[in-house]
Design a protein with these regions (language model features):
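Substrate-recognition/cap regions that form aromatic- and gly/pro-loop-enriched pockets
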Residues: 111-113, 118-173
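Loop-rich catalytic cores of soluble enzymes, especially ATP-dependent carboxylate-amine ligases
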Residues: 1-109
């Protein structure tokens, strides 16, 4: 967090914390990218999702372009100058996934074979549970995910996406 504004408090000589914060990892000081701030990736349809991800990978981000791909010694210091360097850099609270062989791109796997599972990224460990999450909480999460998968719902609008993002920020911070 050096050089970035934050409202964390010192815990000791080397650590910071925020009382009541639920997930620093998913907050604005965690796995976030200002380059992704204006992406409008929704989960209405796999093809639409993949088109948006591909666009984010192939659309240059000025700050990344200015860095260049290699440093002064010719060593790579970034993969590309795209808004997303690779698919796995999409920092969202949930991501469709499919495991594949080493070297296969997540985009290609999802396009060719579809979704195998969802990566739910907004869940942190429960410090009160030795395993990090209880069996009951996993089962509840399973039920919620199954319900969402089988219940028909309307497509996510731009306004709804914006509200979800605002709610995420409010809940995390």
């Amino acid at each position: 967090v050096d050089g970035r504004g934050n409202d964390l408090e010192p815990l000791n000589d080397s650590d910071l914390f925020k009382k009541g914060a639920t997930s620093l990892r998913m907050s604005e000081i965690g796995y976030q990218s200002k380059a992704q701030k204006n992406l409008n990736i929704k989960y209405n349809d796999l093809d639409e999702f993949l088109d948006e991800v591909k666009s984010a990978i192939t659309t240059p981000y000025p700050e990344f372009e200015n860095l260049g791909l290699k440093d002064s010694e010719g060593e790579f210091h970034q993969i590309s100058s795209g808004i997303l360097q690779i698919e796995n850099e999409l920092y969202d609270c949930i991501r469709p996934k499919r495991a594949g062989s080493s070297g296969e791109r997540p985009y290609d796997l999802l396009k060719k074979e579809g979704i195998k599972y969802l990566e739910v990224r907004g869940i942190d460990l429960d410090p009160e549970d030795l395993a990090g999450i209880s069996k009951d909480k996993i089962l509840l999460l399973d039920l919620i995910m199954l319900y969402c998968a089988i219940k028909p719902s309307s497509l996510m609008s731009d306004k709804e996406k914006s509200i979800i993002e605002s709610n995420d920020i409010a809940a995390i911070n």
